[in-house]
Each structure stands twice: as structure tokens, then as C-alpha cells.
Amino acid sequence: MANVIEYTVNAYLSNIRTVLLFSLSFLVAILIPIFAAFPTYSDMGGIFVRTASELLNLNVVSFSIIIASIFFSLVFLSFAIVAINIITKHERTHVRIKKEVFEGLERYTSRVFAVLLLFTVLLSLFDLLLYVSHAPTFIYYLLVLLITPFFFYAPSSVVIDDSRVLHAMRMSVKFLVKRFDYFLLWLAIAAVALSIFDGLFILISPTIVSTYIMLVFNAVFVLPFLVLLQSQMYLKRFAMLKR
């Protein structure tokens, strides 16, 4: 597993300018919920949406604004994820990145958008149904845990395998189950990175300002690295790239 981290760090540093350029899409995707008057809250450098408890009380205009904002946020998020995965594919398979960008970017982005949209809809439905039924909170997290394997590596499969949405979801669950250790490693690195930087920003400036600075930092530096790591892990399914 150590070489996965090594490949990720090397790819991140050697393509830092390109990564930072594409990370602007992550930043836009994260900022849209804030400026669209979402019922949101921030924690550990992330934006979280209060869905069921708030959406049921919205009027038509507010609801329409939120739906449109989610749509555009997912578009920017999809573009950024695809771009980072293209960098990984270029680094490890020596595919010409310009050809990939011009010929596959729109197709990949639309498929990844479909994956993210489906995941978002399912999360919202779970939240809404559990809120209405007054079910215990742990059931929501259990449902999220059950569907996550179908979505975790799906964006990587879309770009690396040129998969369609359903096939990408099948490949995602297949690889996650086969290499569950990679999934645990990714979670551990994400948790440690977010915790460390969150703590540092609180120490530097223990105010609401540090929360928004952390959001920007995560979007520009941390999130691209985690997507790159995820993509590098998925590439391990190819025997010729296991070294």
C-alpha cells in the first residue's frame, strides 16, 4: 500500500499547477451552497446540507433555487473529479492528456455527474424517509454504508475504464470489496488530514473566519489529493500497474 501513497504524492507534486487549476472547480462546487442560501452547516472544513428538516418547510422559489444550486455544484464537482482522474490516467498509462481532455472530458463529466446525482438523490431520500418515519439516526448511516461501495470508485471507473454509469458502479463495488484495505487506508488518510488541518486553522484563528479559510484550503489542496489517491488505488486493479 505504501507505493500507492508514493505514486499519489509524486503525481500531485509533479502536476501541482494543473491540479491547482482544476481544484478551482472544487472550490466553486463547495462555495455554491453557501451563496445559494442553503440550509447548511460547516464542520471539519466541509459543507453539509440540512435536508429533510429544512426542505419540507421551503416555498417553491427557495426549493427551486436549492435544486438549481445542487445541479451546478455537482457539475463543477464532476468536472474537477474527471480532470484529476485524467491526470492519474496520463501519469500511469502515458495516454496523451490533450487527447483525453478534448475527446473525453464532456462524456466523462456527464457520466460522473449522473453518478453523483444518483448518490445525492438517494441520500436525500433516505434522510427524508427517516425524518418522516422518526426512525433512529443510525439507520441512515447504515443505508449510506450499504450504498457507498457502488459509488466510491465509480468516477474513477468512468474515466479509467471508459465505463458507463451502471458498469462503473458494478466495477466500484467489485474493487472495493476485493481491496477493502485500500478503502480503509483512504478513510484513515482523509480523517487524519482533515483533523490535523482543522486543528491548525482553529489554533491560528479560533473564529468563524478560520472555518471558511479551511473550506478554501480543503477545496484547493486536500480534496484534489484525496481524489488523486482514490484514482491511484483504483488503477491497482490492473496487473501491469501493480508495482
Predicted regions and their residues:
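Hydrophobic alpha-helical membrane segments
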Residues: M1-R243
